[in-house]
Amino acid sequence: IPFAGRYRMVDFVLSSMANCGISNVSVVVRKNYHSLMDHLGTGREWDMARRHGGLNIVPPFAEKGVRIYSGRVEALSSILSFLEVQKERYVVMSDANIAINYDFNALLAAHQASGADVTVAYQKVEIPEGRKNDNYTLTVDADGRVTELLFNDYRPGKQNLDLDIYVMERQT
């Protein structure tokens, strides 16, 4: 998504990842991605132009017999063989439609300390009366564990909105 002329929303996430020392990034694309490929180029803008790791753009149909995906789980499934050959211990997933300067290192540390299978980043936000929430809303217990996940929640007041940023340990 274009932002302020020459930038795109993906630039915020990539810059945050680069600033946290993440040097192996794969952008999983679905459709109409030619201009995105032109924009990202080799990844040099984020110091990710490398022979090993760096910035990878993973188009749909990269694997034989894989159909275009419709959600995050299908996207991961479609790149499973790609993920299996990576050497990094953790996978950080983030949508690229958010203007954010995010500390992925803090999220990774929280994930490691929690012992959870998946750690999700969320933000407490005030939802006005009558406004439909198009994000996932999380209910968390006293230990910070997600106990409920709602979509299109209509409840007003303070809500925990999913930022669509996740971290998990890769199974080897």
Label every PLM stretch briefly.
Residues I1-T172:
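Unchanged
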